């Protein structure tokens, strides 16, 4: 039998979490993401709404975002509305109808935003079939074309 003290267990747990969180931040971004975000950040306030635990500001692209809201901060998970309500608080004078939410999950992103009156774009790089009863939004798979697509759709 192997026994550890509570302080040893805490050290082990912290070490394990640090390994996990460091691995969690070993992400390779899709081609064109950085350029698209740089371009969009010149004209729009950008934010991250995530159910995950990666910190956008640990990445080079973090500099393009004005805010990031995790489930920890929202005290909830998408598709519930807490992330979106908090986003409203981050940008003065904006309403849901003036927002655009870009996401890859049909329920947690598209449905969640759509039901609040937020415009949506679906990142569909796997050419997935639309499986929802509500109308499929415009979709894209090439980040290099995103700024032009947004300009055409919403300007």
Regions found by a protein language model. Name each.
Residues 34, 38, 44-155:
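Asp-based, Mg2+/Mn2+-dependent phosphohydrolase catalytic module
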Residues 7-11, 94-97:
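Short helix-terminating capping/connector loops at secondary-structure junctions
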Residues 12-16, 61:
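Hydrophobic side chains within well-formed alpha-helices
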Residues 1-7:
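Helix-loop "lid/cap" segments that line or gate small-molecule binding pockets
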Residues 9-10, 18-48:
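Short, acidic loop-to-helix structural element flanking the phosphoryl-transfer center
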Residues 15-25, 67, 94:
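Conserved acidic, metal-coordinating active-site core of Asp-based
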